[in-house]
Amino acid sequence: GYGARSRDVIKAIIATDKYDVKLLSQRWGATPFGFCENHPEFKNLLDLVVPMPLAQQPDIWAQITVPNEFQAVGRYNIGFTAGMETTLVDGTWVEGMNRLDINFVSSEHSKKSFLNSVYEKQDKQGNVLEQSIQITKPMEVLFEGANLEKYFAKKVNPNLQLNLSLDSIKESFAYLSVGHWMQGQI
């Protein structure tokens, strides 16, 4: 989810050793805090958390969340979002993406969904205005993949042939569902 993605992005930025990184903690729904305290490899991130309000405007502001929550706070503003598993996104998401200088999404499908989302802008009387709502800011795909060294068994049957190509799927339409079944009221 967004928490794991945030930690991955932060670790990668810190690893460049080019920036003075500061973090703001952001609540996500009813998700509990405490991940960093319970995972020693991330405990160092707690030292980077700064209190609100910010003492000064950041040079670079990066926000990792759903686009309707994007706010331009820094001199240069970057958005990271997974997007939506659909063909069109809501107009408020398009407007959120346009508030920032550049946005990163996690798949070509997500990027296409944003680019295909074009809406007529109307005034309060319902009159169509000349201006439309559509993505006007740069958007790039920041691929998130699986580490095959970690997620495939170390000992593979040499007679087993793994076909990792989606081109081999014979059906003209296929739906992939990935989820985690959990008990309610967690």
Go through each PLM region and give its residues:
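Hydrophobic alpha-helical packing residues
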Residues: 13-14, 114
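A short beta-strand-loop structural module common to alpha/beta enzyme folds
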Residues: 19-32
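Extended catalytic core of nucleotide-activated donor transferases of GT-like folds
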Residues: 30-113
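Donor nucleotide-sugar binding/catalytic pocket of nucleotide-sugar-dependent glycosyltransferases
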Residues: 101-162
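Hydrophobic anchor at the start of a short beta-strand
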Residues: 20-21, 77, 139
